[in-house]
């Protein structure tokens, strides 16, 4: 069963935390993570791109000049792709990019992402993060104590003061545990997570 250091928000070690082997100690499945990230990014695409092909552009029904005798290259239509305002070759059309991923694969990918962060010592567990008033300086101080720059902060509840304090820090994103996804876990170099959020993850994914 993986064991990880437990810190307070001042960066001081206050104990150890046993992590569930079934969530934070699984065999990392890179294929599952790749598929889930690919699906997440694909599902964000609008798919509204559109351009006209040669057949759809207006005009160009008449030959611009006769075939021979002008000294110029032969042309059949002013809407051919080589002309300005001509049609687009293989023009993009609106399409649905959505991918569906089995729930079991999503679960495997999430566990793999969490395990990889623990294995690479890129996860920091904090007993709690509390601020009486929004203070960006306090969050920066906490992150500096963990040598965390490009960081994902995961809390059990959307603590308003903490959220307001972290939202303007470059390279830092703060989300409630209910909104975690594989892409964000892999995108950020380090994960700072509260003890309660860890318990919530184990409750859902164990």
Swiss-Prot record:
Assembly, in brief, is: Part of the 50S ribosomal subunit.
Q: Biological process GO annotation list?
A: translation
Q: Annotated region Disordered: where?
A: 47-76
Q: Which SUPFAM superfamilies match?
A: Ribosomal protein L4
Q: Looking at the keywords, is rRNA-binding present?
A: yes
Question: PANTHER family attached here?
Answer: 50S RIBOSOMAL PROTEIN L4, LARGE RIBOSOMAL SUBUNIT PROTEIN UL4M
Protein's UniProt keywords contain Iron-sulfur: no
Q: What is this protein called?
A: Large ribosomal subunit protein uL4
Determine the domain of life of the protein's source: Bacteria
Report the source organism: Clostridium botulinum (strain Okra / Type B1)
One matching Pfam family, short form? Answer: Ribosomal_L4
Q: Name one GO molecular function term.
A: structural constituent of ribosome
């Amino acid at each position: 069963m993986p064991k990880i250091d437990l810190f307070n928000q001042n960066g001081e070690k206050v104990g150890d935390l046993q992590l569930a082997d079934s969530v934070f100690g699984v065999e990392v499945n890179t294929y599952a993570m790749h598929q889930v990230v690919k699906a997440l990014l694909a599902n964000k695409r609008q798919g509204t791109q559109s351009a006209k092909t040669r057949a759809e552009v207006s005009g160009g029904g008449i030959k611009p000049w006769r075939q021979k005798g002008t000294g110029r290259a032969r042309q059949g239509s002013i809407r051919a792709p080589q002309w300005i305002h001509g049609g687009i070759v293989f023009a993009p059309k609106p399409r649905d990019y959505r991918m569906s991923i089995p729930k079991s694969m999503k679960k495997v990918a999430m566990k793999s992402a969490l395990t990889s962060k623990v294995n690479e010592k890129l996860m920091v567990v904090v007993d709690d993060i509390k601020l009486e008033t929004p203070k960006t300086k306090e969050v920066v101080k906490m992150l500096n104590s963990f040598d965390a720059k490009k960081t994902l902060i995961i809390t059990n509840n959307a603590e308003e003061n903490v959220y307001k304090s972290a939202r303007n820090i470059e390279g830092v994103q703060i989300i409630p545990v209910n909104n975690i996804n594989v892409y964000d876990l892999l995108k950020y170099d380090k994960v700072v997570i509260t003890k309660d959020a860890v318990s919530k993850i184990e409750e859902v994914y164990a």
